[in-house]
Amino acid sequence: KIPYEREEQDFLKYRTSADQNFEDWRRSNVDVMIKNIHNELKKSFSKTGKKVLFGISPFAIYRTNTKVREDGWDKGSFNAAGALQCYSELYSDVYKWMKEGWIDYVVPQVYFPFERADVTYHDLTKWWSNLAKETNTILYIGQALYQMGSNEVWQNPKEMENQLKFNCQFDQISGTIFFTYKDLVPGQNPIKDEGLKTIKALWVK
């Protein structure tokens, strides 16, 4: 569970109490870092008057719902029980950062197509929209342009177009961020090329 001997030593030395487990200790360390960045940016703004928005782009699955996974969350998303969770596997309590106002915006990496059955784009996008509304956090959706044409579930050239249209249903979604910039360049594969045409046609309307 602990990949490096040094980290185990640090855990035993720096945990806040004898009953604090490794997972909570790691999450706490990440929380401190995020909070400190937030506080430093606030100090800078008060001195210079120049505001910088601080955001995070987390893995799309924060926590799976308890109806699907025992160690999940009662407000979690509905996806495959074995899917990686940002909270438990990456030790990142994004919801806490949003709720505490430590981040100005969030860009969940919803790098899944509509076609995928175990983890779907529409379910996760709707879930993040609700969470952003609850916490009053600016929301952009991270979309996997780089995946277009990469495997059997990414063969629909209108996937990005359909995702953009789906996003428009939610007032809470302020925009989209494609990963990656280099994938906006044509000539990589026919599916992606056709997809870029549909995106351009949609955006210039």
Map each language-model feature to its residues.
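Substrate-binding cleft of secreted/luminal carbohydrate-active enzymes
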Residues: 86, 91-117, 134-205
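Polysaccharide-binding and catalytic clefts of secreted carbohydrate-active enzymes
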Residues: 1-102, 111
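Detector for Asparagine
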Residues: 21, 29, 36-39, 65, ...
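P-loop/Walker A phosphate-binding loop and immediately adjacent motor/lid segment at beta-alpha junctions
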Residues: 26-59, 117-149, 193, 198-205
